[in-house]
């Protein structure tokens, strides 16, 4: 973790900064909840659920909207040059009608440890960390009424659809 954190910090520039570094390690309660939920919802063993989690270590880069695609490409190239492997990319910044818009990547360190690296615009990060987070937390509670859950999902989509789409965002892919 210290090597990856240090390397990612070295890639920062004006307009491309790491955000929320204090939250890079998934909390113990959050991890336990995810293992329980995944083992139940995906009908897998607790061990299989634990082995499938790759965001115990997670980072977030905030990139300027206008230069998002170029900065993503620069950071990716620097990571790959240093021996990191891009495993997968989920780009919902190019989508509408979704509850969350961002770019979530899974990278593997040179020694084989997988971690998550999210990329956001200033607007998508602010939305994710504030209003969307509150709505998401309520929506995922088992006791949330289905009608209320549907209202929450509609509101998250409405908010996410209001975000600006970075130019050339379709170039952000594996």
Question: Would you name each region that the model predicts?
Answer:
Residues 1-42:
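Intrinsically disordered, low-complexity polar/charged tails and linkers
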Residues 43-174:
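Long beta-strand-rich cores associated with HINT superfamily self-processing modules
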């Amino acid at each position: 973790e210290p090597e990856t954190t240090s390397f990612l910090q070295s890639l920062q520039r004006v307009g491309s900064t790491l955000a929320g570094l204090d939250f890079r390690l998934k909390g113990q309660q959050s991890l336990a909840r995810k293992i329980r939920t995944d083992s139940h919802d995906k009908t897998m063993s607790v061990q299989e659920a634990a082995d499938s989690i790759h965001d115990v270590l997670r980072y977030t880069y905030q990139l300027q909207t206008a230069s998002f695609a170029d900065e993503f490409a620069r950071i990716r190239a620097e990571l790959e040059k240093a021996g990191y492997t891009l495993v997968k990319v989920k780009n919902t910044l190019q989508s509408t009608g979704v509850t969350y818009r961002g770019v979530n990547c899974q990278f593997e360190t040179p020694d084989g440890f997988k971690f998550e690296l999210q990329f956001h615009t200033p607007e998508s990060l602010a939305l994710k960390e504030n209003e969307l987070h509150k709505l998401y937390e309520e929506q995922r509670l088992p006791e949330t009424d289905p009608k209320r859950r549907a209202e929450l999902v509609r509101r998250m989509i409405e908010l996410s659809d209001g975000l600006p789409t970075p130019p050339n965002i379709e170039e952000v892919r594996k």
